[in-house]
Design a protein with these regions (language model features):
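Catalytic cores of carbohydrate-active enzymes across secretory and cytosolic contexts
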Residues: 1-533
């Protein structure tokens, strides 16, 4: 084990527990699962992040039926004070960062930078996760990255590999180059070349518009140049400065988070000269966190999965009643859909043929549970949330929306629903880990062939596919027709009339997902394919 490289895993967010609110969504949950898995496997890895005092957003539905955001101040008594502080120069002023350590969620050490100390003029830089304005965002990324590298050195933690989870940690690469030029006397080209040997990079967003770009004037003003020149920074990130292009040019190897995403990412970044090779390492989830122990025992003992699932479903329905004061029926086919509110995820696709969905809902054949948050400054996403909420008013006995989506809601739904619906516009879903969590609990996936599902789906055996991988302008009509066809001809008849087949499919789903889509498999691939040279 001593021969394994020592890894520092940098990420803007970490989802370790619902009460530790330093995460926004899937990126953070992935990062949290990876730290827990490293602990399980005794791998030499540490996490580097930020202690967000206000977290992401507490998003509730107002009286007008629209989501509204609030930002409570959180304090945590379970963190260890390392006694270490470091400085990062931002906008010409030194910002002091305190370093906290978190190990209390069965995870390897996670070091968190915090500017909320009396010595700082701007203690709020580590207030809200994902700053609203470019200046704030760049400052936060500098704290994570430049501050993270300096924190590890101050803590005397040896690092062989720096893993950038998404492009936010890119300034860490610039800091490593600066160090080599200043302390070791290297020229820029040699320092860059040596730095690349230390960095690996995970790219997530398969949509150009979702990849962060900054104006050079802003970066210079903020201090992200960090001793480098405009010419040197342009060689790394181009002009304007693309954070993803920079990640690809700063790393020795990069990965996409699924096989289909790998194809998409290679096409997207084919014109980036000097980019690292992009391989595919499909995401996975932490079994111990997401797979209910009772369903695992029933699966392992070859006992009645139906009975155990019904128990989990009842627990979910009771939680829904406690939150929403609505009694859903335990014997009705229940479909769950919970994820970030983004247009490409098409949470409303199932409502595209109202004459059919109304018959199914009012006829007692179907009930729907939705949950999800929109980015606070994403008006389109907020409209999606409002539209979903409005459907609960149209069908108050059959549709539920659970507000303020978090890890706890995610656990409840991916254990208690009968079917997990996923219908993004292909190929815009890089991975999508909620379906993996559902699959591990015998909740059957009904999904477009996007993200992870093309790798796991055996139609009619462990879940169902929507369509045949169609990509084109007419995707809305094509996919909605396919969704209804599978729902009416296969999903509903199997649930009500072929109960033994349903249980067999549940067993196949658990068998398919429990290792293939586990974070253990993922992390071992990171070591074998990325970390070990």
């Amino acid at each position: 084990m001593d021969k394994l490289p020592k890894v520092a895993y940098f990420c803007m967010e970490f989802g370790l527990h619902e009460d530790f609110k330093i995460y926004a969504g899937g990126l953070g949950i992935l990062a949290g699962d990876l730290l827990k898995t490293a602990k399980d496997c005794k791998f030499p890895l540490v996490g580097v992040g930020i202690l967000w005092r206000q977290g992401y957003t507490k998003q509730l539905i107002g009286k007008n039926g629209k989501p509204c955001d609030c930002y409570p101040e959180y304090s945590y008594d379970f963190l260890e004070d390392t006694g270490v502080t470091i400085n990062v120069r931002i906008r010409g002023r030194q910002v002091k960062c305190k370093i906290w350590k978190c190990t209390c969620f069965n995870n390897v050490s996670l070091y968190l930078l915090d500017t909320n100390i009396p010595e700082n003029n701007e203690p709020c830089l580590t207030g809200q996760l994902y700053g609203w304005f470019p200046e704030e965002r760049v400052a936060q990324e500098m704290i994570l990255s430049i501050g993270g590298v300096r924190a590890l050195k101050a803590l005397k933690i040896d690092v062989d590999v720096y893993h950038f989870n998404d492009s936010h940690p890119v300034p860490a690469g610039i800091e490593l180059i600066r160090e080599k030029m200043k302390k070791d006397g290297m020229n820029f080209k040699d320092a860059w070349k040596e730095t690349r040997k230390q960095i690996v990079f995970t790219t997530h967003t398969p949509v150009i518009e979702g990849n962060e770009v900054h104006d050079h004037k802003l970066l210079k003003y903020m201090g992200m140049y960090n001793g480098l020149t405009y010419n040197q920074m342009s060689q790394i990130g181009g002009d304007p400065f693309s954070m993803t292009a920079a990640g690809l040019r700063l790393s020795r190897k990069a990965n996409a988070v699924g096989k289909l995403h790998g194809v998409t990412a290679k096409k997207m970044w084919a014109n980036i000269q000097g980019a690292s090779e992009i391989i595919s390492i499909t995401n996975g989830v932490h079994n111990g966190t997401w797979q209910d122990k009772r369903i695992l025992k029933a699966y392992s003992d070859k006992s009645d999965l139906r009975e155990t699932h019904l128990l989990l479903k009842k627990e979910m329905l009771e939680e829904i009643y406690n939150r929403n004061n609505i009694r859903l029926k335990e014997n009705t086919l229940t479909i769950g859909f919970a994820r970030r509110a983004a247009p490409y995820k098409r949470s409303d696709l199932i409502f595209k043929r109202p004459e059919i969905i109304e018959l199914l809902l009012k006829g007692g054949k179907l009930q729907l549970i939705f949950s999800g948050k929109a980015y606070p400054n994403d008006l389109t996403g907020k409209k999606i949330v409002a539209n979903l909420y409005s459907m609960t008013k149209l069908y108050p006995k059959n549709i539920v929306f659970l507000q303020d989506y978090d890890i706890k809601i995610g656990k409840i739904l991916t254990r208690g629903c009968d079917v997990w619906l996923n219908n993004p516009i292909r190929p815009m879903e890089a991975s999508g880990t909620s379906g993996m969590k559902a699959a591990m609990n015998g909740v059957l996936n009904l999904s477009v062939l996007d993200g992870w599902w093309p790798e796991g789906c055996k139609h009619g055996v462990n879940g169902w596919q929507i369509g045949n991988g169609y990509e084109g302008e007419d995707h809305e009509r094509n996919d909605s027709e396919s969704l209804y066809k599978v729902l009416l001809e296969e999903v509903i008849p199997t649930y009500y009339d072929k109960k033994d087949k349903w249980v067999s499919m549940m067993r196949s789903s658990i068998e398919m997902s429990s290792f293939q889509f586990s974070a253990e498999r993922m992390l071992k691939e990171y070591y074998n394919l990325m970390y070990i040279q």
